[in-house]
Amino acid sequence: MAALLLLLLVSAGVLLSSIEAQEAYSQLPDNYRKGVDLALQQLISHSGVRYHYLFFKSLLKSDIELGFDVGYIYHNFYLKATKCGKGTVDVTQCKFRDDRPLIDCAICYKTFAGEIEKEPKPYVHCLHKPALTEDMKTTRVDHCRTMSYQSGDSTILASKGSK
């Protein structure tokens, strides 16, 4: 009986964590959700990816609004594998896997009127967390800082973001 109760509690915890992650995603501002969606599209396009991934949590968010509906976004976040296969349409029942490492993603891009601009090309860098080195993290941030938009524009990481 105790084993059944334990199994029920663990199952409820897994379902709640999946629901909390979906809630965390839905609470992101729209301009950040579009970046997460872009990273997920690139991730599932790789043939080696077998599972569906969901947004897990934000590590760092930074944005600059320059006016005239132009903005620059930097977002560092985790994706987590689910037990659902790649290509799953209804992800509401997808429970997180705890046997796969998190994927650490950093993305920076320019927006105009709430849409991601094609130029300059958005930068998306996602890697399994254990493989991510401090040098790689520095390279990511440097790349986003030096993305050349137009002379005189602010850089993405010039503002102080929120965690």
Feature names for model-found ranges:
Residues A24-Y32, E65, D69, K118:
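Short amphipathic alpha-helical molecular recognition features
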Residues S11-D30:
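N-terminal signal peptide
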Residues G85-K163:
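Compact beta-sheet-dominated globular domain cores
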Residues A2-A3, L38-Q42, H46, K57-L66:
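Beta-strand/loop motifs with alternating small/hydrophobic and polar/acidic residues, enriched
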Residues Y25-H52:
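Short, non-transmembrane alpha-helical segments in secretory-pathway proteins
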Residues L8, H46-L54, V91:
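Short, flexible/disordered secondary-structure transition segments
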Residues M1-V10:
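Classical eukaryotic N-terminal signal peptides for Sec-dependent ER targeting/secretion
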Residues Y53-Q93, D104:
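Exposed beta-strand-loop-beta-strand "reactive/processing" segments of non-cytosolic proteins
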